[in-house]
Amino acid sequence: MQFHERFDVIVVGGGHAGTEAALASARMGSKTLLLTHNIDTLGQMSCNPAIGGIGKGHLVKEIDALGGAMAVATDFAGIQFRTLNSSKGPAVRATRAQADRALYRHKIQEILQHQTNLRIFQQAVDDLVVENNKVIGVVTQMGLAFEAPAVVLTAGTFLGGKIHIGLENYSGGRAGDPPSIALAHRLRELPIRVGRLKTGTPPRIDANTIDFSLMTEQKGDNPLPVMSFIGDVNDHPEQVSCYITHTNERTHDIIRGGLDRSPMYSGIIEGIGPRYCPSIEDKINRFADKTSHQIFIEPEGLNTTEIYPNGISTSLPFDVQLNLVRSIKGMENAEIMRPGYAIEYDYFDPRDLKNSLETKAISGLFFAGQINGTTGYEEAGAQGLLAGMNASLQVQGKEAWAPRRDQAYLGVLVDDLSTLGTKEPYRMFTSRAEYRLLLREDNADLRLTEKGRELGLVDDKRWALFSEKMESIETELQRLRGQWIHPNSPLVEALNPNLNTPITREATFEDLLRRPEMDYPKLMSIDGFGPGLEDQRAAEQVQIQVKYSGYIQRQQGEIDKAIRHETTLLPLDLDYQEVPGLSNEVIAKMNEHKPETIGQASRISGMTPAAISILLVHLKKRGLLRKSA
């Protein structure tokens, strides 16, 4: 049965990747359909009730800078906000919010339902319709066919999903939801490499059975951070505390005693789990010398007693889960409301994707989120936005776009995946970015919002606020650079007590701000130097740009040198056997990875500078030197 309307873009899946993909495509004017197996679970936080953190918070800010929904929803749902690494430099500072699951889901659904050009339909997808290596639509569980020249697949952990608790297992996409078995079989027919990964979640605890007085309270920051560049602290709901406790040697003995019934250690689970979010049984095994592990006791919302014990993800049998929970300080009488479990699922090798997240094998088919081997809401949301945007661009006959590694963490994420691939769930860290001084949370809008506006992702309200902020920053920087003070100035009397050494020669206000002992609020509070900017985010930007200007210029110089050939395109039909001077090893690597650019080729493990030079000479001789947009 054919659906009565045709769409430009179809998005399959309504998690963090799917919602951002659908919203991005619709914002850009494409007639978009979001297909989900359950409208009520759109925007569901399937695992931990938190958004942001080191590396992840940077991605959220970038999604926001491009007009996405994640940061806005977090501001309306966040019940505790903290700035991590606040004592360190701005490059590694990151915002993290504890979120109320219900409020977050509600806000995402509200944004989806009010988005023009977006239709939502509840049906699981069982089949892709492909003709001549080009996608032309999908078919749902009940045989309803939808047509579109671009399809974005964001199936999360649902493809061939299998849930494990102890030695018992059953098919599922997550607890309470069915898996996508038919679609998984269909995708395995495509010429795209497939593998299995695993992730897990801890048991949920009833707060009424926890003794919080035996734990360490962890309050949020004051003043409260905001996640979105257009957000306000007044958007935040009531704020609550988290708590910290620890496992102990008794806990570890209980876990060791249950390993013979662990699906991970009995060989039942074959998928590789996340290195940076291991199960508690994996921690005990890998770090056998540690006598305790930290656990964060996180509320799941304001109107629920469910607690998420972050740090004890497990797939051990229920009786072992209960015993290990009750061995932990403050949880001696705890009751489990939902058992922890592990889930195995299909993922597809992201090296088979272009950096637009379109599959190389099937034109018009895009993958985003855990299907590409990543883990985390933020990584999924960022990919979803990029895939939805590029699906829309393709339908409009425009060239695909993806940020470079020096432009965004999203650029690092996509380049890592499409160039290097992954054999374990990929998680973003600031350490993955070589140009992290330029890729800060605070300047994500300065880096990306103008491009987002050009692409049609950024609405008038966000653009007006951004333009006002940019003008404020530029005007204030010009003022600081243009105003001078000399040793005999009447302003010196008020200034010198705030300096480590009095000024002895003429200096601009910018020179004063560059001093280690001076910051922008202090300088503006001194008579004759203020009043300065009222907008705290603009003021922060002024301070960072002044204090780090030398380092920023140096890093920009490195980038300018590095990107000289970064975007030089490698023709898809280039026969590497015909390139004189390439070793058989390099030819094999190029044929396996199929890089789109010289930059991607240079990051393939084992690729030599000599091989890159040979490729460039060959392209030049053949008149094939072209750069991507």
Curated annotation (Swiss-Prot):
One of its GO terms (molecular function) is flavin adenine dinucleotide binding. HAMAP family: MnmG_GidA (MF_00129). Gene3D superfamilies: FAD/NAD(P)-binding domain (3.50.50.60), GidA associated domain, C-terminal subdomain (1.10.150.570), tRNA uridine 5-carboxymethylaminomethyl modification enzyme MnmG/GidA (1.10.10.1800). Coiled coil: none annotated. Belongs to the MnmG family. One of its GO terms (biological process) is tRNA wobble uridine modification. Its cofactor is FAD. NAD(+) binds at residues 273-287. NAD-binding protein involved in the addition of a carboxymethylaminomethyl (cmnm) group at the wobble position (U34) of certain tRNAs, forming tRNA-cmnm(5)s(2)U34. InterPro entries: FAD/NAD-bd_sf, GIDA_C_N, MnmG, MnmG-rel, MnmG-rel_CS, MnmG_C, MnmG_C_subdom, MnmG_C_subdom_sf. Pfam families: GIDA, GIDA_C_1st, SAM_GIDA_C. FAD binds at G13, G14, G15, H16, A17, G18, V125, S180, Q370. SMART domains: GIDA_assoc_3. Homodimer. Heterotetramer of two MnmE and two MnmG subunits. Keywords: Cytoplasm, FAD, Flavoprotein, NAD, tRNA processing. It is found in: Cytoplasm. GO terms for cellular component: cytosol. Its main location: cytoplasm. This is tRNA uridine 5-carboxymethylaminomethyl modification enzyme MnmG.
